[in-house]
């Protein structure tokens, strides 16, 4: 009887210790908030890379993004589904940290190194990394290696900007593809549909980025309506006649809508 009691006591102690270890290490909620490691890449005052895995191209350095962008580790990039999402980041792990929050948009992928070894990792642009620092201490923060931050998912807000559709350089009437840029709110999309002139809405395929495409068996003619469904809240908006009948590859077309 005594040995049985000791066995159950040890079992209970083991279960408690397991629970304690789990709680100590559980510092993330990928969909919401937690702590993460942060590094930076590219030029000290730059936008990380010109373009990146999400397909935004040179737009990352220009308004309304202003180079306040980041590559996401696997959990945040999420096979491209994280493109366009926004995160508030507060630096906590270095004396040069200002403690003031910044907001960045995920525009690129960081697949290796510390990005892959941590549950959540944020690889900031040089400009965004400097924005985490106290005045005059940006270089100290950039030279610190991996620092710790608090992060949380934030609503994207591009004031005075509506959604833009930038046609892919290889797009044609049989293969229509474009990047969707500057979505307010969730920042990501769960569904994109295109409606050609005189036709019905056709679901498009996300290309592990902010690029969406449709391969049609026949030529699609514009003008095109585009119906967008946001990723988290599933709000739906329609950009009517946003891509004209005489559209051209590598051109951008600005809508009059946003979430």
UniProtKB/Swiss-Prot annotation:
Transmembrane segments: none annotated. It comes from the Eukaryota. SMART domains: DPBB_1 (SM00837). It is a peripheral membrane protein. Disulfide bonds join 54-83, 86-156, 91-97. InterPro entries: Expan_Lol_pI, Expansin/allergen_DPBB_dom, Expansin_CBD, Expansin_CBD_sf, LolPI, RlpA-like_DPBB, RlpA-like_sf. Residues 51-161 form the Expansin-like EG45 domain. Residues 1-23 form the signal peptide. May cause loosening and extension of plant cell walls by disrupting non-covalent bonding between cellulose microfibrils and matrix glucans. No enzymatic activity has been found. Glycans are attached at residue 25. It is found in: Secreted, Cell wall; Membrane. Belongs to the expansin family. Expansin B subfamily. This is Expansin-B4. GO terms for cellular component: extracellular region; membrane.
């Amino acid at each position: 009887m005594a040995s049985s009691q000791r066995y159950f006591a040890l079992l209970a102690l083991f279960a408690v210790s397991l629970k304690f270890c789990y709680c100590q290490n559980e510092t993330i909620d990928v969909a919401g908030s937690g702590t993460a490691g942060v590094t930076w890449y590219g030029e000290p005052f730059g936008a990380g890379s010109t373009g990146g895995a999400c397909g935004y191209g040179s737009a990352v350095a220009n308004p309304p993004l202003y180079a306040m962008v980041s590559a996401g580790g696997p959990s945040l990039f999420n096979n491209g589904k994280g493109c366009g999402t926004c995160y508030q980041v507060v630096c906590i792990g270095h004396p040069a940290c200002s403690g003031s929050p910044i907001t960045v948009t995920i525009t690129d992928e960081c697949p290796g190194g510390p990005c892959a070894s941590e549950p959540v990792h944020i690889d900031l642009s040089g400009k965004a990394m400097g924005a985490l620092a106290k005045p005059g201490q940006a270089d100290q923060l950039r030279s610190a290696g991996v620092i710790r931050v608090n992060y949380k998912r934030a609503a994207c807000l591009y004031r005075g900007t509506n959604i833009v559709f930038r046609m892919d350089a290889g797009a044609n009437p049989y293969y229509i593809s474009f990047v969707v840029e500057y979505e307010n709110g969730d920042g990501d999309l769960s569904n994109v549909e295109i409606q050609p002139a005189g036709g019905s809405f056709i679901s498009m395929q996300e290309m592990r980025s902010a690029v969406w495409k449709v391969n049609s068996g026949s030529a699609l003619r514009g003008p095109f309506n585009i119906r967008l469904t946001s990723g988290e809240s599933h709000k739906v908006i329609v950009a009517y006649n946003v891509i004209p009948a005489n559209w051209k590859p590598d051109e951008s077309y600005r809508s009059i809508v946003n979430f």
